[in-house]
Regions:
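Glycine-rich Rossmann-fold phosphate-binding loop(s) that bind the pyrophosphate
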Residues: 8-9
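N-terminal Rossmann-fold NAD(P) dinucleotide-binding loop
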Residues: 12-13
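NAD(P)-binding Rossmann-fold cofactor-contacting core
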Residues: 24-37
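Conserved Rossmann-fold cofactor-binding substructure of NAD(P)-dependent oxidoreductases
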Residues: 44-56
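Beta-loop-alpha module in the N-terminal Rossmann-like domain of NAD(P)-dependent dehydrogenases
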Residues: 59-75, 90-91
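Rossmann-fold NAD(P)-binding glycine/threonine-rich loop
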Residues: 86-106
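Rossmann-like dinucleotide-binding core of oxidoreductases
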Residues: 103-156
Length: 156
């Protein structure tokens, strides 16, 4: 199975490295040329180039800037390539929900929402009744380096 990861920042590289270690054939794409294995230079806002990349794989994992996800999802739906993203952006998720496609589309599959929802669901199943569940996700570093004392992730 061939998996394309769009976005070669910290998260995208980590996803690609993990998938490759599990035996998947992985291509990783970004607009900035990176010296990493199986790298493809790609401007994800260029529909022609994006379509060519999407057609070359079975699954796309979008780990790029959230505002590019609508276009990436549209191309995946048109081409028939399964799509995952890590966005928390509800506008992107609503756009994907409205796509007329039989292609597997899975927005919001990152940490929160995503993994935290799976954890909550698993915990809920262990009880007879549940009145309320509150899950929180944060990134509090051991050695804060900014005024917010919070770990800045993604494109910060």
């Amino acid at each position: 199975m061939k998996i394309g990861v769009i976005g070669a920042g910290k998260i995208g590289k980590t996803i690609a490295t993990y998938l490759a270690s599990e035996g998947f054939e992985v291509k990783i794409a970004d607009i900035e040329n990176r010296d990493i294995p199986n790298f493809v230079e790609l401007d994800a806002s260029d529909k022609t180039a994006l379509t060519e990349f999407v057609k070359s794989v079975d699954i796309i994992v979008s780990a790029t800037l959230f505002h590019l996800n609508k276009g990436i999802a549209d191309v995946c739906a048109e081409v028939g390539t399964a799509y995952f993203d890590l966005t928390e952006d509800t506008e992107v998720s609503e756009h994907i929900r409205k796509l007329d496609t039989k292609t597997f589309m899975m927005p919001q599959s990152g940490l929160a929402p995503g993994a935290v929802n799976i954890i909550a669901s698993d915990l809920i199943r262990k009880f007879d009744t549940v009145n309320e569940v509150k899950m929180r996700v944060g990134a509090l570093p051991k050695y804060p380096s900014n005024a917010m004392a919070y770990y800045l992730t993604w494109s910060t």
